Amino acid sequence: LYFNDKERTSALISICSLLNILLPDSQPNKKIYDSFEKFINSINLENWIFLYIFFEINLIKELGFDTNLTEYSNNIGDDKNFLKIKIDGYIYEIPNYLIHKKIPENFTNLLIRKSLYFSRQVIQNKFFIPNNLLFPKSRIILENYFN
């Protein structure tokens, strides 16, 4: 069904790789499962990539690290698409729609790329680097589709 769409296929492989590495064996996590199922059911939508990004943000939260992006909502100006914030000593440039938790009506590859880059950086800084884990290449490949 998705094998003729490299971006969607790459997203599925990426999610499976992240879950395989980050989730403990034999431990059920209903919220992550429900979030994954919701993404799978929505992968045919035009804005599927934003649902993928929100899946990753939710995964970060469910694994014990909430980015608390809504606390930055007062720092957003009307003319800015991105905001630089500091989380646990790391500076991130994040798209405003992630702070508002609202999928943008108009989107570009730049917006998608910066969104994916933000979630990758948080995942790496919180889970992969401290635990000396290899980040999945499939996730980087997905990001490269939006260059």
Residue ranges and their predicted role:
Residues 1-147:
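Non-catalytic alpha-helical scaffolds and adjoining flexible linkers that form interface surfaces
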